[in-house]
C-alpha cells in the first residue's frame, strides 16, 4: 500500500506545509477584502483573518432599520465568502508541487 512512498520526504513536506500555513496566516492580516451592498449604501472591509476592520453605512439607511439589517447581512456574508475563497486558493497553491510518492 505504501510502496514507492518516501515517508521521510512526506514528513519533511508536512513540516514545510505547517510553516507555510503559519506564514500565510500572518500575511492574511495584511490583505483586505471589501464587499458592498445596496449599490454601495453599505461597505464592509475585513482582513484575510476575518476581522472586520472598517464599515461605512450611508446616512439614508439610518432611518430604515430593516433595510440596514438586510444589507449589512448581505455585505458581511459577501466579505466572508471572499475571505474563504482566498483561503481555499492559498491552500490549493500550497499543495501545488508537493508529491509524497516520489519524483
UniProtKB/Swiss-Prot annotation:
An MF annotation (GO) of this entry: DNA binding
Location relative to the cell: Cytoplasm, Nucleoid
Membrane-spanning intervals of the chain: none
GO CC entries: bacterial nucleoid; cytosol
Pfam families: YbaB_DNA_bd
InterPro entries: YbaB-like_sf, YbaB/EbfC
Principal location: cytoplasm
Keywords: Cytoplasm, DNA-binding
Function, in words: Binds to DNA and alters its conformation. May be involved in regulation of gene expression, nucleoid organization and DNA protection.
Record note on quaternary structure: Homodimer.
Protein family: Belongs to the YbaB/EbfC family.
Descriptive protein name: Nucleoid-associated protein SUN_2278
Species this chain originates from: Sulfurovum sp. (strain NBC37-1)
Species classification: Bacteria, Pseudomonadati, Campylobacterota, Epsilonproteobacteria, Campylobacterales
